[in-house]
């Protein structure tokens, strides 16, 4: 895939400082999941050059309605969808689109969970035009980082290559 939004197919390159910022975020929020966005120049679709932390609203939603939102930020992340939509629009307008949503897993692997898949794909369609990075933090230590991309026409995700430069 080349051209517009080719980053959704994966094989991305992330700057070392950007990855370090994401890893630091995951360690700072442990034992709770962190989340955020990664963007890069529209002119270089596979390049990831900036990270932006977002608030994990899982605890807020759990407190308001524990039946509908039974999980807390310990095992779940929730990004405000209205704020996310605005962030995607602003990033596109600035010619530095959001290419990745990242989050951490605490005391679990860097897999893309069934909950993650259900949140970000429905009826074979991707909710946001991006890929996903999952950071694993085990007992307060960084364990793994993986890039996940949507399999078009399905609700499945596959691992892809993430190069650090």
Task: Show the residue positions of the predicted features.
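Conserved beta-strand-loop surface patch within small alpha/beta domains used
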Residues: 1-98, 107-165
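Residue-level "edge-of-site" marker
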Residues: 104
């Amino acid at each position: 895939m080349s051209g517009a939004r080719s980053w959704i197919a994966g094989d991305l390159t992330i700057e070392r400082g950007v990855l370090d910022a994401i890893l630091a975020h995951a360690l700072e929020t442990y034992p709770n999941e962190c989340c955020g966005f990664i963007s890069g120049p529209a002119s270089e679709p596979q390049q990831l050059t900036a990270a932006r932390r977002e608030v994990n609203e899982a605890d807020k939603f759990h407190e308001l309605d524990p039946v509908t939102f039974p999980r807390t930020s310990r095992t779940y992340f929730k990004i405000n969808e209205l704020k996310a939509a605005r962030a995607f629009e602003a990033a596109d307008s600035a010619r530095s689109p959001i290419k990745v949503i990242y989050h951490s897993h605490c005391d679990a692997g860097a897999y893309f969970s069934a909950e993650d898949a259900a949140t970000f794909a429905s009826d074979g369609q991707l909710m946001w035009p991006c890929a996903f990075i999952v950071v694993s933090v085990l007992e307060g230590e960084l364990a793994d980082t993986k890039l996940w991309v949507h399999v078009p026409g399905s609700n499945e995700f596959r691992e892809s290559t993430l190069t650090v430069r």
